[in-house]
Amino acid sequence: MNFQAGGGQSPQQQQSLAAPGGGGAAAQQLVCGGQFGGAGPGAGGGGPSQQLAGGPPQQFALSNSAAIRAEIQRFESVHPNIYAIYDLIERIEDLALQNQIREHVISIEDSFVNSQEWTLSRSVPELKVGIVGNLSSGKSALVHRYLTGTYVQEESPEGGRFKKEIVVDGQSYLLLIRDEGGPPELQFAAWVDAVVFVFSLEDEISFQTVYNYFLRLCSFRNASEVPMVLVGTQDAISAANPRVIDDSRARKLSTDLKRCTYYETCATYGLNVERVFQDVAQKVVALRKKQQLAIGPCKSLPNSPSHSAVSAASIPAVHINQATNGGSSAFSDYSSSVPSTPSISQRELRIETIAASSTPTPIRKQSKRRSNIFTSRKGADLDREKKAAECRVDSIGSGRAIPIKQGILLKRSGKSLNKEWKKKYVTLCDNGLLTYHPSLHDYMQNIHGKEIDLLRTTVKVPGKRLPRATPTTAPGTSPRANGLAMERSNTQLGGATGAPHSASSTSLHSERPHSSAWAGSRPGPEGLHQRSCSVSSTDQWSEAAALPASMQHPASGPAESLSSSPKLEPPPSPHSNRKKHRGKKSTGTPRPDGPSSAAEEAEESFEFVVVSLTGQTWHFEASTAEERELWVQSVQAQILASLQGCRSAKDKTRLGNQNTALAVQAVRTVRGNSLCIDCEAPNPDWASLNLGALMCIECSGIHRHLGAHLSRVRSLDLDDWPPELLAVMTAMGNALANSVWEGALDGYSKPGPEACREEKERWIRAKYEQKLFLAPLPSSDVPLGQQLLRAVVEDDLRLLVMLLAHGSKEEVNETYGDGDGRTALHLSSAMANVVFTQLLIWYGVDVRSRDARGLTPLAYARRAGSQECADILIQHGCPGEGCGLAPTPNREPANGTNPSAELHRSPSIL
């Protein structure tokens, strides 16, 4: 973090990165040069409004990371310079002049803090127009006339940044005008939505400059993506300065500039000035609509043959950059709601846009056709409601998960006294949820529905199970067992809490507690039994033999099984020959043909059960065996997908989007990290976090004995590396650490890789415990605590490490000035410095300290917008109280002070 004036950039770079400032009630703001603009190019912050095409040169491939770092550096350079001005103001002896200058600086600072990137809603669309031409072109007079209605003859060499409201097709836009002081550069080309080329009709050089600027712009960006307007100014034409560029030459140039529109203007009395900017705004809006129509069908319907054209009035003009700036664009929502139809009229398209917010609705069903992604059931005897559901299965909007399987199933009621079978509209989604509604209408209206999280469930078919194991064979070891399903079942059972399970695997409806093979299977405290794993293979189900009813152990969970007593027997399914009066199952001694009878009866219904680890059961029944098979397989696939998603969740959060190997390699490549910090053994793979250094495995064992207050040891390959720890390791390294801890060797020799452990331990303890070789502090009359504050402000990492190594707990917790209360941790949090914040906490700075206004370091981190610093502080117990308190600025201006700006101010301790 650089607090040098200008953020280490040239004035031209600062100008090109600056955006329009905010603050002030004027309809437009004139901020020449843009030195106090908001962070990021433009109000939306964020690069080109259209994707660059046509194979741009290599220099255009500027990474987002580099651009972001440059913008942060520019942004953070403003406040230190402003506060340096405040310090200089204090030296002015004339108090009246001092107060006047201070008020002006405060106004500038407030305009910077309240720029549109911090205040303007992302829903406000923007148009970014660049004005280019040489100093004699008259472009500054053109812009000034448009903004103020007056004529100013002077040309602005540095250009300017301006804002004005403009209305296009009945919609208001924030027009950002960038008067470029020189030729178009890469950043300018990436920023603009449109370009106005300006030349003077009485100046040949300005005329020739236009085409040179055009060629330069084309080297950075495809000219077909940028609307252009050519303007010839008449302001300087007089008897002494006659017209040099005739109309034919000007129109020939407009043809060379991709046939752009040509205007002649006069800023003296306003000829065509308003028309130029209105026309360029119209061109930008029209281009965006054209791109929306081109992108929309491809985005939602990659295989659609054709779409009818949509009039411009039917689609609201929306800034295409909103997708980048605000997270989503209105158009992306619009395009995702276009249905999968070969041809769509304008009227239907408007209906779809209106109905997209409530998914699905009866309006959406009017223009639907039968979906071809679900299999037809022409051979099945389905009732009318089921056929209607099948015809309208694609009536699913973008607001809900798309089902991978859906249809009408019978579900048994969970009420103990009246367990009836009722029709339900059941959907299985790819997010691991099984939902059911009383009807298709309720599903489409998203009401009266219930859902089952399949993560901790299994699916079973009553009367069918895995082949029974013999007493000498462990359950589940049959060669025909499905290993994948067994593994899933074990994972589910292992993840349960509060419910004991046995090691053996049996069927939920056929427990055998008296058998030696199932001796471990008995009801738990909540009536739970160990369940067998689900196997979707039909031959495994068919091989299972039903047990006699006298040997069946009834389930005692919340929902009774089908083998329970006669008085609790639920009524048979309506699908079973549609007989509502089927007789009760016999619970007496079975006949010799009992098993076959049970199998025949099981074939009459096509039921399957979803069972959770908590003992809940949901009974469903399909119309055919094939349909049940498909449902069971689909549910099992989603159970497996849910489990796999849980297993990979940790991997996704370890390094965010970074690859572990790349992150570790980045730590290894830091200067000095190729050798152990203590014995110089090659390729160290252990780390000390607070030292920011790598070491060999033998030295790491010695460091562990030092204690975590001296060295926090972690494996480079075996442990997790969150971003904040990686930031510390990559910022420091062995070379920096040894420049501090071995800064005063005075002839001592380090032990080598072949030295014995005792010798290495003596060296390490002398180095870190006794601090015998610690580099001396620089000679200064400033106390150590104040030097620490200075090191944080100046972003001096080596000095910070040295001061922390020398300092006591009282010294590192010293505050800045009397009555201020800010510690070094407050300052590092306000500066969003993750490395300094983490090191200060490790070396004993109090995370609970508060400044004079009652603010904790967490409040400073949140005001600075640093989620990384906030996470570190919360992890170490920093309280969040006080983050909403308004700080009291140190300076005491009369009016207009912005409290939030004070948190960005680094203390003036130099």
UniProtKB/Swiss-Prot annotation:
Mark the residues carrying the PTM Phosphothreonine. Answer: T359, T361
Question: Cellular location of this protein?
Answer: Cytoplasm
User: Region labeled Small GTPase-like — which residues?
Assistant: 119-410
One molecular function GO term is: zinc ion binding
ANK repeat windows: 783-812, 820-849, 853-882
Identify the tissues in which this protein is expressed: Widely expressed, with highest levels in brain.
GO BP, sorted A to Z = cellular response to reactive oxygen species; proteasome-mediated ubiquitin-dependent protein catabolic process; protein import into nucleus
- The residues that the entry says bind GTP are 133-140, 177-181, 233-236
What the record says about activity regulation is: GTPase activity is stimulated by oxidative stress.
Fill in the subunit field for this protein. Interacts with PML. Interacts with expanded polyglutamine proteins.
Function, as annotated, reads: GTPase-activating protein for the ADP ribosylation factor family (Potential). GTPase which may be involved in the degradation of expanded polyglutamine proteins through the ubiquitin-proteasome pathway.
Which family does this protein fall into?
A: Belongs to the centaurin gamma-like family.
Instruction: Specify the protein name.
Output: Arf-GAP with GTPase, ANK repeat and PH domain-containing protein 3
State the organism named in the record: Mus musculus (Mouse)
